[in-house]
Structure formats: structure tokens, C-alpha cells
Swiss-Prot record:
Residue positions binding [2Fe-2S] cluster: 122, 196
Job description of the protein: Functions in the biosynthesis of branched-chain amino acids. Catalyzes the dehydration of (2R,3R)-2,3-dihydroxy-3-methylpentanoate (2,3-dihydroxy-3-methylvalerate) into 2-oxo-3-methylpentanoate (2-oxo-3-methylvalerate) and of (2R)-2,3-dihydroxy-3-methylbutanoate (2,3-dihydroxyisovalerate) into 2-oxo-3-methylbutanoate (2-oxoisovalerate), the penultimate precursor to L-isoleucine and L-valine, respectively.
Stated name of the protein: Dihydroxy-acid dehydratase
Species of origin: Magnetococcus marinus (strain ATCC BAA-1437 / JCM 17883 / MC-1)
Annotated positions of the N6-carboxylysine modification: 124
Superkingdom of source: Bacteria
Keywords: 2Fe-2S, Amino-acid biosynthesis, Branched-chain amino acid biosynthesis, Iron, Iron-sulfur, Lyase, Magnesium, Metal-binding
Amino acid sequence: MPQYRSRTSTHGRNMAGARALWRATGIKEEDFGKPIIAVANSFTQFVPGHVHLREVGKLVAEEIEACGAIAKEFNTIAVDDGIAMGHGGMLYSLPSRDIIADSVEYMCNAHTADALICISNCDKITPGMLMAALRLNIPTVFVSGGPMEAGKVRLTDGTARKVDLIDSMIAAGNSAVSSEDLERYERSSCPTCGSCSGMFTANSMNCLTEALGLSLPGNGTVLATHTARKKLFLDGAKRIVELTRRFYEQDDVSALPRSIATFAAFENAMVLDIAMGGSTNTVLHLLAAAREAEVNFTMADIDRLSRGVPCLCKVAPSTEKYHVEDVHRAGGVFSILGELNRIGLINDHCLTVHAPNMAEALKKEDIVSPQVTEEALTRCYAAPGGIPTIEPYSQSARWESLDDDRVDGCIRGGEHAYSKDGGLAILFGNIAQDGCIVKTAGVDESVWCFTGPARIFHSQDEACDAILADQIKAGDVVLIRYEGPKGGPGMQEMLYPTSFLKSKGLGKACALITDGRFSGGTSGLSIGHCSPEAAQGGAIGLVEEGDLIEIDIPNRLLQVKLSDAQLAERRQAMLARGNEAFKPVGRQRVVSKALQAYAALTTSAAEGAVRNLEQIHIKRD
């Protein structure tokens, strides 16, 4: 029988000093011997997805203690990718994932916590906490802060529609949008607390924790403002106490994250991601999480899965019609999983934190299942309140009806899929030998095959300036390099270049290729994560202005129209530059010591941009 980890610091004569300190945190004599559960919060006033989490942390901690355990809360950092976007702040976003993972490990191991509940939400926080949970392998439940309500804007010409953050960015670059209308977009796009309302990175990852089995149903789709979210937090607190007792008091290893997040569970998460056209960033994060779990889940597996999964759900930014609140009305993640299971694409034997296995969970949680529970149906009626607020679970609006239309609704059945090809695809070729990724759900099928001249840029700032100055024309392939994990460093998101292409009416007329990455809010022919990156000697660094680039999504191909001999000749010329080989030309960028340390240890996007300590070389005399 495993022993509570916390006994290390709470029992024995030699731990009198530690117990004295525990008492100073509020622990009473009768509490010693209870499990200590770490509440990893990520409250910050910088991020709308996290601005409400101070109250949530208190709620969760109180419920844990009501269930007979000790709750000890701490906070991690949280970077808002939208605020950090378009300037040097974006260099810090992806590196923050490792800082978050490390901080959770440090706190849990330093204080011998027995279990962990993760109150995450936005882009790098859920992945960072997921990496930590799988690294620690102690009982863990994820309860995210929940998605933001979609905004509603009425423009000066009287037109009205739903909007999100990306609409403001596109409008800003469109000179045809008046200053008054731009202000209306700005004031309407982000009306409440929560993670931005489309199927962007934050919501994608919070949905994927459901498919992995590490969070409760509704985690990815119940709105932050709705009272149903409060129940989810309370249920999560109860569940972590149950899992903790199961492992330590019943020797039930099925309560551990690595027993739940197996290879088959990672397949389920990726299949969901492909079917719902999730953010391309999820590929980075799933690869990184799998590595922490010691699961051999690779780009080859993602490529294999992407070729056989249809697109069953389209949400902003891939369509203006639906946002995450609409996915919830249609049954949420478990209804997408249910449709995938009906066509044989889900490993339903996988464990979850809330049901014996995925098969049992699907029976109860899929709203079109004959055995769906009343609780699941009630949860899916949770609707947006339409009132701007940063208060959590502050409204209880209900949809008049659920969307169970699997022919023309938000979620489709296999026979009525949006497309037989899923929403994400891995491409390979002579400038992406280790692969790259495109969100096909957001690409108009008319440009799935595209050839055009390369326009070369060594920073996204340079590319944005060219786009806004009308130097990019229809048919061009904008190629931004030296923005990968090492080359940036930090692998910046390219949301502004893609948004500005749309602003200029070029969203379906140009392609953008990078060894950097894209925001979950990106759509259009945007291909990222080209590996190896330019800074590591990748052939993307050998492309020259005007070279023809061929993109063939159906055949999973990305290449520059040059022979192997021509590329070899260019490589020799590049290497002849010595210390300046495979470095950006003319770019002025201050790189802090923190980012230099990240660059020294990080790996390729094809490996999840995780750290590889083998890259440390110690000089010895």
C-alpha cells in the first residue's frame, strides 16, 4: 500500500520543525494524517481567462477541506498571448510553458503534496500544468476557468453579428473599417472573463483534457460566467479527494495520471483535435505532455491519425457561425467523441477521472445517447448571459433547446461530416523534412493546392510591415523564418501577419509559411512548425526570394521547387558564412538571458519544443 507522500514532512520526531511551520499555515492537530492536496491556481489580473480564478481557488480549497483533506493553494504565472502578441512579449509565451511545469513540480515535491488539482485556462497554462501532472504522476484533476462568451457587435450601418478577439485584429488592419466601427469591435469582442470564445489554443487544450480523461465533462465548454461552472469546480474538488484516497488507501493505480493518459488516450485526444479543427499549438503541447508521461507518441502518429479522421465540428476561427458556447449547446466534447466512437475512431477502453472507462462515460455524457443522464442534459443547457462581467458563475441563462442536429448542426455525424479530411494535417517535403502543420479546417478548399513565389522575411515584424504597405500581392507565399524555438527564440505566434492578410483581402489568395507557430485564432493557408527550423540548419533557411513554393494539402506535401543538387549547393554556400550561417540577416532583437537559456535547451517543434538536457556541453580543462 503506498504511503501518503505528505507523511515525509508531517510525521516523526525529526519533523517537529516542519510541523511547526505547517501549523503556522493553519493546520490543526487533528488535521495531521489527512492527505495534502495542492491547488495549483493561475490567477492573475493580466489575463481575462484568469482574472476570476482567485475566487475559484478559494471555492475549490474549501470544498476539498469539506471532503476531509487539506488544501494548500499556490499560483503559477500566466501569459496572455493576445496581449503579448505582435511585439517582443510573444518571445516569452512558449517558454513560459516550461516555467509553469517546473513551478508546479517544485511546489508539489518541495512540500510533499499527495495530489494535485489544476485550475488552469489559457494557452500555455493548461499544457504546462499537464506536463507537470504527468511528470509528478500523483492523483490529478483539471478544472479550467472556462471559455468567454462570444461578443455581439452592432456596427454603424446597423449590421449585427457575433464576434471574438480575432475580429478586432482583422478590423484594425482594414482601412475600410472606420475608427468608430473599430472601437465597437474592440469594446464588443471580449465581453466577459474566460478564455477567448473560439476554438483557439486555450479552449482546444481544455477540451483535450476531457479526451485524455483528466478532467470532468464540460471542462472545455461550460462558460466561465455560468453557474454550471461552479458545480464543475465543486465536483472537481470532490473528485480529487476520491482519487487521492483510492490511490493511497486502496492501492488503486488507475487513479494516477499515467494510468489514464496512455498512448491510446493520446490518440483519443489527437483524434478529437483533428475532428474539431483545434489549434495547431495543441500538437506541440500533446507531444510535450506525452514525453513527460513517457509515452512514445510522435509526429508520425499524428500524421497517421490525420489521414483517417473527418472534420465533425467547425468553430471560430474556421467559421463565423459557431463559437465554443455553441459546441456546448450541441453536447460539448463528449458528443464529438460520441460521433467519433460511432465510426470506430475512439479507444473507448481508456480510463477517466470520472468514469470507469470512456465507453461508460460516453453512454452517460453524449446527449444523443439513449442512456444520457439528466445531469449531462441539464449542463448542456447552460447558455451565455449576454452581460459583460468578470465575475465567475454569475449568471444562469439557459438555451431554449439543445442542438442535437447531426446533419446540419454544429456537431456532425460521420456521414454528414464537414469534410472527410480532418481539421489538421501534417505536411512533409524538402523544406519540412521532419514535418509541419496546417489547420485545414480553416483553409478554403480552393487553395488546398497552391504554388507561388516566396517572399522572405526574418521576423514577423518585417512581414507585417510589408503586408500593411501593400507589398504582398495575390499569389505570394509569405515565408517567415528564424522564428522557431531556437531561432526566435521562443517560437512566436504569427497571428498579426495572418490577420493583416485578411484585412487586405488576401486571406484566400496568399499562403504563409513559418518555422514559428500560429495562434489558435489563425485561419487561412497558414503552415507552421516547419522542422527542422532555420536556426538548426533546416532547408527553410535556404529558400531565396522568388523561389517557387508548392503546397499540396491532399498529398501532404510542402516543397520548394529546387533539385536536391541545388539545395546542396545553397547549403554549402550558407555554411561558408561560418558563425553567421543559418542566422537572420539584419535583424535587431534583444534576447534576454532567460530566453538564451531557453534557446540553449529547447528542441524542434517536431519534438514538442521540449527541453533536451543532452544539449548541455560542459567544458573541462
